[in-house]
């Protein structure tokens, strides 16, 4: 496990509780020592006892030596700078798994794309994990699920097998684009939810933004080649609900501080860990413009961050149009002949997401256990 923040440590716990031999790499020696000897991470997971089998080190080579699977949980904007140091310790068949939910500034690349550029490994050796995964809840062993995605079904299954235990279940799919963009885009909607929460707006406003936000997410992801059903599952709607509704979400918290009147600079100073949504707004809008995708919610979040839109003015703009229009609850990709493709209803999204969480069955066609 490369990274010892809240999510990296929690996922290391998931893997260790599943019977795997796990070593965490922490940048700070004192944190590595606390995890290794005290089985605690008081900086990021206060009150959580870590598995006795879990080990930690501040030496990257020691952590990676002989590893069949390397999970990476670092701030998305620091990923590329850390990849070179990993190269000497990669085995010929090592699988690298991204736990990150962001896009790289400047390039707009997803984390799996950054890994593919920075490491000398085949695409079949790269996987991503996403879903409704608030770290502290999982560290407390509250049951949940996630999706493991890779272009190689065998790789996805191997990683999902490692990342399954009595309180955490992993499904699989091969839609890496949809799985990653679902995790990225829901962060932006969660910032919007936090803003209106900080302003003091109620549940009607938040429900409107979540519903319209899912349409924006699906439109964007489908424009870049995703299967719309992926956005209906755990990596899309499931993650969106969890992130928007929980005070444990860093993106929700960042938005709430903005809504309460704090500046973008002040919010960044107050956050003890990165809120990936803040860094992803600008590159996502650039990608949306490149494909002609309208994202009014994300655009207004950008305006709030820039200080050109007052937080109290965000909700009316998000939930109304200049003229009455039909409600579109389907993500659509328009082809050259004008026909809409890849449609998915909000009701269908809800049904598939809840089906996936039922023990032992009812998963969507795209996310298979």
Swiss-Prot record:
Q: Which family does it belong to?
A: Belongs to the NAD-dependent glycerol-3-phosphate dehydrogenase family.
Identification of the protein by name:
Glycerol-3-phosphate dehydrogenase [NAD(P)+]
Q: What's the encoding gene here? A: gpsA
Q: Which GO terms describe its cellular component?
A: cytosol
Q: Where is this region: Disordered?
A: 312-369
Output one GO BP term. carbohydrate metabolic process
Provide the active-site residues from the annotation: 186
NCBIfam families per record: PRK00094.1-2, PRK00094.1-4
> Do you know which InterPro entries this protein is assigned to?
6-PGluconate_DH-like_C_sf, 6PGD_dom2, G3P_DH_NAD-dep, G3P_DH_NAD-dep_C, G3P_DH_NAD-dep_N, NAD(P)-bd_dom_sf
> Which terms are listed as keywords in the entry?
Cytoplasm, Lipid biosynthesis, Lipid metabolism, NAD, NADP, Nucleotide-binding, Oxidoreductase, Phospholipid biosynthesis, Phospholipid metabolism
Residues that hold sn-glycerol 3-phosphate according to the record:
101, 131, 186, 239, 249-251
């Amino acid at each position: 496990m490369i990274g010892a923040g809240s999510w990296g440590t929690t996922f290391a716990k998931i893997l260790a509780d599943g019977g795997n031999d796990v070593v965490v790499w922490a940048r700070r020696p004192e944190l590595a020592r606390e995890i290794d000897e005290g089985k605690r991470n008081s900086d990021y997971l206060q009150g959580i006892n870590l598995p006795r089998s879990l080990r930690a080190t501040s030496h990257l080579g020691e952590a990676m030596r002989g590893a069949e699977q390397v999970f990476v949980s670092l701030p998305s904007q620091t990923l590329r700078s850390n990849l070179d140091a990993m190269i000497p310790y990669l085995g010929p068949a090592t699988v690298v798994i991204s736990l990150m939910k962001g896009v790289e500034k400047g390039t707009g690349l997803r984390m799996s794309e950054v890994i593919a550029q920075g490491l000398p490994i085949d695409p079949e050796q790269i996987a991503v994990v996403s879903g409704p995964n608030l770290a502290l809840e999982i560290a407390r062993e509250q049951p949940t699920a996630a999706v493991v995605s890779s272009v190689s079904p065998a790789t996805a299954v191997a990683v999902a097998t490692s990342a399954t235990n009595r309180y955490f279940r992993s499904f699989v799919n091969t839609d890496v684009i949809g799985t990653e963009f679902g995790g990225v885009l829901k962060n932006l909607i969660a910032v919007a939810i936090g803003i209106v929460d900080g302003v003091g707006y109620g549940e009607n406003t938040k429900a409107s933004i979540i519903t319209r936000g899912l349409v924006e997410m699906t439109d964007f992801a489908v424009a870049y080649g995703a299967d719309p059903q992926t956005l209906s599952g755990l990596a899309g709607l499931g993650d969106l609900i969890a992130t928007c509704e929980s005070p444990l979400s860093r993106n929700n918290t960042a938005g709430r501080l903005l809504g309460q009147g704090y500046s973008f600079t002040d919010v960044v100073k107050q956050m003890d860990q990165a809120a990936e949504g803040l860094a992803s707004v600008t590159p996502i809008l650039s990608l949306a413009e490149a494909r002609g995708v309208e994202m009014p919610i994300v655009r207004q979040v950008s305006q709030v961050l820039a200080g050109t839109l007052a937080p109290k003015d965000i909700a009316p703009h998000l939930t109304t149009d200049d003229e009455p229009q039909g409600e579109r609850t389907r993500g659509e990709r328009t082809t050259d002949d004008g026909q809409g493709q890849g449609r998915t209803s909000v009701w269908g999204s809800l049904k598939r997401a809840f089906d996936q969480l039922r023990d032992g069955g009812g998963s969507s066609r795209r996310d298979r256990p």
